[in-house]
From Swiss-Prot:
Its cofactor is Mg(2+). InterPro entries: CysQ/Inositol_MonoPase, Inositol_monoP_metal-BS, Inositol_monophosphatase-like. Its EC number is 3.1.3.7, 3.1.3.11, 3.1.3.25. Pathway: Sulfur metabolism; sulfate assimilation. The keyword Zinc-finger does not apply. It holds the Pfam family Inositol_P. GO terms for molecular function: 3'(2'),5'-bisphosphate nucleotidase activity; fructose 1,6-bisphosphate 1-phosphatase activity; inositol monophosphate phosphatase activity; metal ion binding. This is 3'-phosphoadenosine 5'-phosphate phosphatase. Substrate binds at E73, L93, D94, G95, T96, D216. Belongs to the inositol monophosphatase superfamily. It comes from Mycobacterium leprae (strain TN).
Amino acid sequence: MASHDKRDYQAELTDAALAADLATAAGELLLEIREEIGFDQPRALGDAGDRLANSLLLSRLRAERPGDAVLSEEAHDDRVRLQAGRVWIIDPLDGTREFSTAGRTDWAVHIALWQRTTGGVADGRREITDAAVALPARGNRVYRSDTVTAGAVTGGVPNILRIAVSATRPPTILHRIRQKLAIEPVAIGSAGAKAMAVVDGDVDAYLHVGGQWEWDSAAPAGVVLAAGMHASRLDGSPLRYNQLDPYLPDFVMCRADIAPILLGVIREVWQ
């Protein structure tokens, strides 16, 4: 397996460029792991992917941003992050189930940088300052917050809203939304793949209820917001990161033009 732990670290990389570089490197490593281990033992494949990608990212961040804190799905939660001014929120492998299944491409790598705001004002746009989401099995495509643009949409608000949901755990609120809006659920694997489908214009929204962790949505939200789209809690309040408890109960990411409509319906039916 080739080494992805760079020796010639580039201190001049911007935070956004570093996020993209890290996502790319982790994606390349995960593709190699998939090739070498194969799919006969999915649990072993997933465990190796989680562990080795996490090790790579932590090593790179220690070398290139030694003063920053890290919150990772695959590492101990060091509460020093709560006093830190800069925290990298990472998911080395988003969608372990999909990664471990032959032919699936809807898994991702998430890299986000949270920075403390001043004056007590905080929202998703200001807190997640730099982000990258890689889809390694789709040509290792990387969506980065400093270059992303939303996919072209035409014809105004669609008659039927395409909403990305979990294939295994679709949110129950969809039934109530359907009583008010014409919707088409679209099953997609990982959180990152769902959110980037919104960015690409393949779906109109990504709705999640039932809880995730900060690393599941930080980088996707950073990219979605940078693309000029909407990301918030279901009640419309800002997404908050680097919290004492990194559990995030719900969120919606969607086209900016449908956000008022979708949030309005959610307010009507959500209890």
